[in-house]
Amino acid sequence: MKYNVEVLVTLKENVRDPQGTAVDTVLKRTGLEDNAGVRVGKYFTLTVSAKNDDEAKEKADRICGDVLSNPILESYKIGRFEKL
């Protein structure tokens, strides 16, 4: 079976986010928002092949932890998870 997985990878709270700071600066400069607290992340969609839901979730978790994120600096959250 195949599963569609959506993943959001973000910097951990204690890690400085220069891209987020840059967006915050532009928002303040343009008068759109004074302090939006922007944090920049990465969004992934992938298709995982597995025999069942549990195996697919384990495989997606392994992919996220080993390939899509740097566990020292980033955390990830598996969002939508659906059987195709």
Identify the residue ranges that each predicted region occupies:
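Short glycine-/aliphatic-rich beta-strand segments at the starts of folded cytosolic domains
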Residues: 1-13, 42-45
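Long alpha-helical scaffolds
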Residues: 3-5, 50, 56
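Non-catalytic surface loops within mature trypsin-like serine protease
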Residues: 9-13, 50, 82
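Short amphipathic alpha-helix segments
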Residues: 14-31
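Short, conserved charged micro-motifs
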Residues: 14-18, 53-58
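N-terminal glycine-rich anion-binding loops that anchor highly charged ligand groups
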Residues: 33-39
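Short, charge-patterned binding micro-sites
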Residues: 39-52
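C-terminal structural segments of small proteins and small subunits
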Residues: 57-83
